[in-house]
A protein has these predicted regions:
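C-terminal catalytic/acceptor-binding lobe
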Residues: 1, 127, 136-211
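Short, acidic, metal-binding catalytic loop of nucleotide-sugar glycosyltransferases
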Residues: 1-14, 21-22, 37
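A short acidic, amphipathic alpha-helical/loop segment
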Residues: 1-4, 59, 85-87
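Active-site-proximal specificity loops/subdomain of glycosyltransferases
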Residues: 16-68
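Short beta-strand/turn micro-motifs composed of small residues
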Residues: 19, 100, 166
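Short beta-strand-to-loop acidic/aromatic patch adjacent to the donor-nucleotide binding site
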Residues: 67-78
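Conserved donor-nucleotide/metal-binding helix-loop-beta segment in metal-dependent transferases, i.e.
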Residues: 81-105
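Conserved nucleotide-sugar donor-binding
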Residues: 111-132
Length: 211
């Protein structure tokens, strides 16, 4: 995933890889000498607290510049080479919106998907760590589903629209939109968290969102 982000015409200014000192969900710990070294100044390793899947955002939150674009992505996906360029273009046109290449609809608001890239203006992240500590940290289902609570925070607390860029995906030979990532990962994490059936898992996740 990191290589796919670096191997493109428009590179990110910085890539933060956030690795907790100790995980809440696992017994294993990762020592500094076990972390791969990157021969590129763009990539920076941050050791931090375990915030669940939201570690990818909260782990380096204090290092993010104001009025800039942060893109959340999954480290087990290989992304298309136009992802950063597309996000940057739409951000430049309307920076007060958030964007994802897939937005899951849920009543009044949509849920941006980190797996499909989730682009956010850092100006709207003020207060998100307090929200995590007060609302998310001790609620297992929310702790494990960062896309949901981050989207909730942006929409209801920051009045941020979360817009889908699905119609701007490239199409395959059959004329269907191709995902923004090349490597498809089965959503087993969602199933493990909420149930054996993916449909049931999504329904339970949505029920959590509206409680």
């Amino acid at each position: 995933s990191i290589k796919s982000l670096l191997n493109r015409s428009k590179k990110p200014d910085k890539i933060f890889i956030n690795i907790p000192f100790k995980y809440r969900r696992f017994k294993e710990t990762i020592k500094d000498d076990e972390i791969p070294k990157f021969d590129n100044s763009i990539v920076e390793i941050t050791r931090c607290e375990d915030y669940g899947p939201a570690t990818k955002l909260l782990g380096s939150l204090d290092k993010l510049e104001k009025n800039s674009l942060v893109i959340l992505f999954d480290d087990d996906h290989v992304y298309e080479n136009y992802m950063v360029e597309k996000f940057s273009y739409f951000y430049s046109k309307a920076p007060n919106n958030a964007y994802s290449f897939y937005v899951h609809p849920l009543r009044k608001f949509g849920i941006g998907q980190g797996a499909d890239g989730f682009a956010i203006n850092t100006n709207f992240l003020n207060g998100i760590k307090d929200f995590y500590n007060k609302v998310v940290k001790d609620y297992k289902e929310l702790f494990l589903y960062d896309d949901l609570w981050i989207s909730y925070f942006l929409y209801f607390f920051k009045k941020n629209k979360i817009l889908s860029l699905e119609n701007h995906l490239k199409k395959d030979k059959d004329g269907k939109f191709s995902p923004i990532y090349k490597k498809h990962i089965v959503a087993s994490g969602l199933v493990e968290t909420y149930g054996e059936s993916l449909i049931e898992a999504v329904k339970k996740r949505d029920q959590i969102a509206i409680e």
